[in-house]
């Protein structure tokens, strides 16, 4: 472990503790799914909680008590509406603070202090946090566009707990980014307002990685959407088919892989050394790996001719 990471792990603030807990929870869940069937007692409620969309049990195999908590999967758009509004709001305040010297509202910098924003900020650059917040906002806008104009949602569902977590997730993510901004002792004014003088090589690299990952994720969502449309772009069914093209040639869920790469691009933009964001990346890795693994199992069980060389999440590895 890098010395800077080891030193910072000894002083977990609330945000780091939260992301570490989430990452550990999803790691444990993934490991439980990797255990061969029959070695551990099954739990329908647990399985229903961790699955969504096509990977949920269909028909009468799901207990009635589980179906009570169903929410349409098309409500995914709500996550990105909240994210676009909230992170746009945070970006507006950060822009005002950086360029106009306007302090954050009292309630906002008070909340950031509670989350631990006043700790470990000596080595951060304001430009890094500004760019990452821009990336997060643009990512939310693109995903919102895809929900309305690219994706074709069937009548599949998600659990109400997953829905509520999704609503909170991007609020928490935006606050995590903002908490990395170097500020004065009162956590009200941004330190280092001359952003152009802060530009580093890793900002360029992070931006290129973000664009590259976003383009591939968009392509994958277009491929998935087109499986349910005719050549004129009209939706003709909501069945599942085997996707081909782009990163689908390597993994079953390249959209999840691209999501991970997007968050890694943000870690690069932070200069590689931001422990808080690497904990976010760790959570994203295990949560997306879990979803990809369940999706991979679905494809393999449904299609006899499913390509055997495809992995679930990481090309050639997993």
UniProtKB/Swiss-Prot annotation:
The chain crosses the membrane at residues 20-40, 81-101, 120-140, 157-177, 195-215, 266-286. GO terms for biological process: dolichol biosynthetic process; dolichol metabolic process; dolichol-linked oligosaccharide biosynthetic process; polyprenol catabolic process. GO terms for cellular component: endoplasmic reticulum; endoplasmic reticulum membrane. Residues 1-19, 102-119, 178-194, 287-318 are cytoplasmic. It is a multi-pass membrane protein. Pfam families: Steroid_dh. Its main location: endoplasmic reticulum. Keywords: Endoplasmic reticulum, Lipid metabolism, Membrane, NADP, Oxidoreductase, Transmembrane, Transmembrane helix. It catalyses: a di-trans,poly-cis-dolichal + NADP(+) = a di-trans,poly-cis-polyprenal + NADPH + H(+); a 3-oxo-5alpha-steroid + NADP(+) = a 3-oxo-Delta(4)-steroid + NADPH + H(+); androst-4-ene-3,17-dione + NADPH + H(+) = 5alpha-androstan-3,17-dione + NADP(+); 17beta-hydroxy-5alpha-androstan-3-one + NADP(+) = testosterone + NADPH + H(+). It comes from the Eukaryota. It is found in: Endoplasmic reticulum membrane. It is an enzyme of class 1 (oxidoreductase). One of its GO terms (molecular function) is polyprenal reductase activity. Plays a key role in early steps of protein N-linked glycosylation by being involved in the conversion of polyprenol into dolichol. Acts as a polyprenal reductase that mediates the reduction of polyprenal into dolichal in a NADP-dependent mechanism. Dolichols are required for the synthesis of dolichol-linked monosaccharides and the oligosaccharide precursor used for N-glycosylation. Also able to convert testosterone (T) into 5-alpha-dihydrotestosterone (DHT). Belongs to the steroid 5-alpha reductase family. Polyprenal reductase subfamily. This is Polyprenal reductase. It comes from Ailuropoda melanoleuca. The gene is SRD5A3.
């Amino acid at each position: 472990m890098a010395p800077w990471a080891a030193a910072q792990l000894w002083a977990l603030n609330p945000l780091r503790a939260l992301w570490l807990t989430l990452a550990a929870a999803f790691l444990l869940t993934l490991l439980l799914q990797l255990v061969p069937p029959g070695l551990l007692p099954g739990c329908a409620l647990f399985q229903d909680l961790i699955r969504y969309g096509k990977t949920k049990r269909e028909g009468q195999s799901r207990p009635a008590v589980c179906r009570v908590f169903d929410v349409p999967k098309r409500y995914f758009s709500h996550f990105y509406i909240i994210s676009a509004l909230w992170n746009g709001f945070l970006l507006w305040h950060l822009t005002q603070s950086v360029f106009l010297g306007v302090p954050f509202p009292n309630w906002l910098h008070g909340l950031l202090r509670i989350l631990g924003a006043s700790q470990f900020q000596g080595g951060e650059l304001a430009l890094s946090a500004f760019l990452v917040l821009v990336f997060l906002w643009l990512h939310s806008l693109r995903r919102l566009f895809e929900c309305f104009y690219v994706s074709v949602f069937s009548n599949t569902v998600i659990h109400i707990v997953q829905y509520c977590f999704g609503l909170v997730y991007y609020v928490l993510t935006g606050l995590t980014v903002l908490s990395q901004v170097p500020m004065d002792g009162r956590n009200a004014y941004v330190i280092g307002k001359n952003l152009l003088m802060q530009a580093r090589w890793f900002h360029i690299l992070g931006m290129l990685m973000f664009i590259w990952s976003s383009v591939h994720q968009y392509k994958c969502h277009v491929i998935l959407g087109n499986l349910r449309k005719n050549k004129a772009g009209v939706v003709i069914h909501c069945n599942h088919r085997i996707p081909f093209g782009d990163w689908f040639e390597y993994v079953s869920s390249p959209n999840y892989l691209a999501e991970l790469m997007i968050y890694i691009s943000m870690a690069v933009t932070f200069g590689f050394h931001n422990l808080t964001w690497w904990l976010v990346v760790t959570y994203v890795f295990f949560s997306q790996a879990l979803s990809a693994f369940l999706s991979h199992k679905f494809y393999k069980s449904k299609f006899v001719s499913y390509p055997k060389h495809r992995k679930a999440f990481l090309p050639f590895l997993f």
